[in-house]
């Protein structure tokens, strides 16, 4: 799953950014699905991040965490992971984060909507 920011320019309007969750197997697959979803509209992908979570939240709102995890890759780099957690308030969301991630260092924690799931 990828969290994709799409810059959309509709005729006569200022460009807007929308975030969509995209079920895809690769970045090429993400690009294909976004182009299909926004065919006929001036739309560009401005960012794309892999996102890890166990459930897909259909209501379009969740708590996003960017986490620097102490996982070493083959080239000895630390991994930055993005998680999505649905919670009714900030306190619960942070509690879920600590239970789920444990020792990871939280580098951002925000609540924001996404606009839909593109399959």
What do the PLM-derived regions correspond to, one by one?
Residues 1-17:
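Short, extreme N-terminal segment that most often corresponds to the first beta-strand
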Residues 5-8, 92, 117:
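Intrinsically disordered, low-complexity sequence elements enriched in Ser/Thr/Gly/Pro
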Residues 8-12, 26, 69-73, 86:
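Beta-strand elements of well-folded, non-transmembrane domains
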